[in-house]
């Protein structure tokens, strides 16, 4: 699944019927050849050129270096505004570095390297409470777990963070008040929450996947519209 093995399947067929099947998983490290110096130099040059071009693409001047919590809050706010959603639910493992004072696309590539888009769903207060109960409970188990696949390019899941609402002691708070069970909200998440097996309550909902922007591209749009030049 992660490129560690090659799959080899040998089928024996007689008269249109399969009579034997042999399956083998072969470690890719047994087949990887050492790169020669010319290949290594080419790869390094392409990587550096890509970073140089992204670094030239100025996004915003925040005036100062943000700390980690401030960077998280910026991402939460950006996601809500750029997807026209009321609420958002993310995890700190998505944010790989802090931002500011100058922000370029190279900074956003490093801070939010994930190949993830956003998923939006409409929920009642009761449904949101069920989602939060599941996500916050699972997050305690996932907090320090290495996550791979589904576009995630970070290390661990981290902690759950919420945008425009709070989940405390089993209650939802929105605009400094307890949410009614029948209230309706638009909630936006990274698509990983929908595709993964961690959160079956989310997979059961009708979800709209938002194209074409990746997470970092939404943040770039927000900063261009709201950040100082």
Regions found by a protein language model. Name each.
Residues 10-12, 22, 88, 120, ...:
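Structured core elements
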Residues 1-53:
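Active-site-adjacent helix-turn-beta-strand microarchitecture at beta-sheet edges
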Residues 1-2, 28, 92-94, 192:
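Residues that form or immediately flank small-molecule/cofactor binding pockets and catalytic motifs
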Residues 33-110:
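Hard-cation-handling environments
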Residues 74, 85, 94-229:
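Feature captures C-terminal
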């Amino acid at each position: 699944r992660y490129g560690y093995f090659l799959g080899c399947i040998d089928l024996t067929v007689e008269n249109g019927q399969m009579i034997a099947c042999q399956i083998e998983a072969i470690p890719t490290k047994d087949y990887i050849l050492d790169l020669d110096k010319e290949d290594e130099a080419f790869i390094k040059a392409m990587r550096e050129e890509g970073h140089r071009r992204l670094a030239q693409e100025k996004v915003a001047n925040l005036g100062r270096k943000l700390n980690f919590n401030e960077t998280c809050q910026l991402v939460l706010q950006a996601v809500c505004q750029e997807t026209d959603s009321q609420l958002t639910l993310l995890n700190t493992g998505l944010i790989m570095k802090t931002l500011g004072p100058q922000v370029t696309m190279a900074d956003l590539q490093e801070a939010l390297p994930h190949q993830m888009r956003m998923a939006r769903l409409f929920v009642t207060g009761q449904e949101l409470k069920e989602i939060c109960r599941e996500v916050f409970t699972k997050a305690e188990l996932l907090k320090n777990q290495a996550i791979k696949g589904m576009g995630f390019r970070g290390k661990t899941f981290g902690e759950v963070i919420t945008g425009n609402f709070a989940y405390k002691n089993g209650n939802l708070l929105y605009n400094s008040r307890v949410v009614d069970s029948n209230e309706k909200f638009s909630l936006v998440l990274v698509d990983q929450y929908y595709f993964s097996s961690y959160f079956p309550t989310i997979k059961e909902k009708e979800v709209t996947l938002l194209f074409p922007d990746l997470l970092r591209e939404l943040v770039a749009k927000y900063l261009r519209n709201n950040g100082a030049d």
